[in-house]
Amino acid sequence: MTNRKSMLAYAGLAALLFAGPAEAASDEIVIGGALSLTGVQAPLDTPGFKGAQVAVKALNDAGGLLGKKVTFVNIDGKSDPVTVGNVAVELIDKGAQLIIAPCDFDFGGPASREAQAAGLVGISTCASDPLYSSWSLGDKQFTLSMWNTTMGATAADYAFTERGWKTAYVVTDQFIAYTKSLSKYFVEHFKTIGGEIILEDTYTNGDNDFSAQLSRLQALGTKPDVIFISSYGTDIAVMIRALREVGYDAPVLGGDSYDDPAIHEALGEKLGNDIYFVTHTWMGPEAHPDMPKFIDLYKAMYNEDPDTSFVATGWDTVMLMAEAVKMAGTTDGAAVAKALEEGEFKLLTGDLEYQDAAGGHAPDKAAVLVELNAGKPSFLGWRRPASIPNP
């Protein structure tokens, strides 16, 4: 996308954090968050909330934004789409000029719809379904994340091209748009590059019973080279445990929902092996030279190390907003959206460019691969598929 964009200078992390302080001002730039701190969405949104808080403090310590203090107000969306929409309305009524939406289309879409109705830019910390687009939500709405087209293709490329796994068994949780489209794009790309899907099955989040699916798999009389499970929360561990207990020891692949320490703990040292997932970044210097600076700031605020890349998505969302506001010289929704469309952004979660509104605000972004062994994650590196499915 670079050849269709004007090359705009990006000040970068160091400029945001270490530039001289701006002139003091009595007014504020208010960022409103509808991130869910309770419920099923909390393992993704709470880390983002923490990362956003670190970013706001860093901005204010460096003098603020446009000479103004940055204030971040988050109201718990409670993992309920209706509540998320109502929270967004409340935040806008209280003066929010930018909206941070939850990390999912089903849970975050209502916040971005309200932002759009108010003429404000909204950015989801990590929604990856292509429904999180200007096509569905409006010309001022964006997601920080790669789309599932990239996430699914990255997983398929790793399986077939890098590891030589030719056959796959796919389980799709019917929970939300994210889980369904991630499997869709994995399957499409895996077949395109020569892989064979021996069986596709479904699961309903919260069932905690995988026996019917196991019966159908066992009836095939053959074992797959790789197992792709698109699910959410600790149900992922339920399915992996069930498969391992009856002798299916093939490697397991998944998406960014696996980037959850609770899942790693549930699997433990015995079951948390030969598992691979695609996510947003890695919380170490291997992923980005500025990551140690962020980790130090995070530890100073929370007295603990960040343990998931969703922390970095919160930081990056605020810093992305800040850079776009600086470029626009205003928080006006149309101007900030234009800056986001025209900019090239270097983030902890990877370099990012957006297509214009007609192109859905599709994000051009790489992905990170992580391996889980003995219940502990390790960094495999950045990946960018040579081709991806159409959304």
Label every model-predicted segment:
Residues 115-118, 183-280:
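Extracellular/periplasmic bilobed ligand-binding domains
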